[in-house]
Regions:
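Short, solvent-exposed loop/turn elements at beta->coil junctions and helix N-caps
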Residues: 46-52
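Surface-exposed interaction/gating patches
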Residues: 2-22, 34, 114-117
Length: 117
């Protein structure tokens, strides 16, 4: 039986000038615990510009997640808690709560290209 194909999920959030720390803190406190409970594994986090926050400029924050195969992807997508209840409203409330701090956000789902290792 083949191993499940790892799927990467890249969150990209553009924080308004001076708001990167607030967005980062909210994501860490309010989003990461639920994502981990849905089976997502946080692989890495980055920011641009590198290393510093410049209060006059927007900053882009990136979080790279992984899930194992299609089953893992559907688990995070369907937003079910361990007790079977639906947490989509919780996720929506989180994104709405940081919207005033951001210029926009993107989420990309990534896999290896066919024929590549």
């Amino acid at each position: 039986m083949a191993e499940p194909r790892r799927i990467l999920i890249l969150d990209e959030v553009e924080a308004k000038p001076g708001m990167a720390s607030a967005v980062r803190d909210a994501y860490r406190q309010d989003y990461i615990p639920g994502a981990k409970a849905r089976g997502m594994v946080l692989e890495h986090a980055w920011q641009h510009p590198p290393a510093i926050e410049i209060s006059e400029l927007p900053a882009t924050l990136f979080w790279l997640w992984s899930v194992e195969g299609e089953a893992g992807w559907w688990k995070q997508r369907l937003s079910r808690k361990d007790d079977g209840s639906d947490e989509r409203e919780d996720k929506l409330a989180f994104w709405q709560s940081i919207a005033p701090l951001t210029l926009g956000r993107k989420r990309r789902m990534l896999t290896d290209q066919p024929g590549d290792a």
